[in-house]
Amino acid sequence: MNLSIFKRVFCGIAAIFLFIAGLPVLAAAGAKIKIDDTKFFQIGMGFRGSLTVEEDAATSGTDSSFNPATENFRLYTVSQAHKNIQVEFNTELNANDVEVLDSVAKLDLGVFDLWIGRQLPPSDRLNMDGPFYLNAAWGYPAGAQLQSFGNQGQFGGRDDGIAIHGDANGGKLEWAYGVFEGLEGGADQEDNVRHTASLTYAFDDAEPGFYAGSTYFGAKKITTLNFAMHHEEDGVGTATDQGDFTGYSVDALIERTLGNGAVVDLEGAYYDWDTDDKFDNTITQGDSFFVLASYLMPGKTSIAGIQGQFQPYTRYVGYNRDMKNDTAKTGYTDVVEAGVNYVIDGFNAKVTALWQQTDDVTKIDQYVLGMQFQL
């Protein structure tokens, strides 16, 4: 790292910690208005901001770029109209516009739940995590998802459809199946639907709910395996050269609390995307994997009066493209990443600093400083 990069990163770190020092203690949930014993309205928010310095990425071609960004700003709302009926409506800032993220009615039918509307289709753990509930790492593994399962649908990986969710064996076995809009137009001239499914088994503690997190910060003993698959006839290609899309993934998470109170997490996933050997602008045929290890240090420290725990981590991503993607790239890419989090309040408040090197046609080094807060 040259002196210019060091100064910029150092100033960014100092600014963020000074900002944190002036924050009030954050609550673990948003505001909730109780109407009666079964009806309520709840609202919350989520923010993720970052500063990225990339070597040789300035217009000059020899200087480092300096890019601050608001990566996510979300407003969450949940309305319970009946003890068995909830409506979730979430929005996110997208550039200068506010987009609908989720707009879904959830019916608890006892044996299973029925969800209708715009939602996240059943998928791999990373997609279910979303950006706020990843373990340790700041962003999704580059290329690991070979483009998100849901990116042919609506904003943020969501899609319009209907899904059912259920569990058995005390919540250790969870399953989900959905039918979604999928690709509209283009190769899909017959308005085919996309079928999505996931099957999860927890060998140790059960994980609650459909949405997942990739760590429990030591609150659970986790050994969980998940399988997901998506399929759409004529889901890729062009109007004159269609192909069927099939994608599947297998992911695993292991979490253990050591005798000294430290928490170790090991996470990994494998993805395979098949586009019927057709070129597609949104989905790239190929396979990929990632492995991640993190170590949440025992005990809390204090920085500027804010108590938290340090969590160093490392991640490796391998990404092999069989077909050209939308930037005409093929072949193997690997990404090495190392960083540290300052975990203040679980997923609700943390600061991340990381280095990432992407080895594609050329090697690209990035330094990222990020912070996320939820209410």
Predicted ranges, named:
Residues 3-48, 170-172, 375:
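N-terminal periplasmic/intermembrane-space "pro-region" immediately following the signal or transit peptide
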Residues 10, 69, 246-248:
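Intrinsic disorder/low-complexity signature
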Residues 22-26, 56, 128, 279:
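Amphipathic, positively biased hydrophobic alpha-helical segments used for protein targeting
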Residues 30-58, 62-185, 189-207, 211-215, ...:
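Outer membrane beta-barrel
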Residues 36, 58-62, 106-108, 216-375:
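Outer-membrane beta-barrel pore domains
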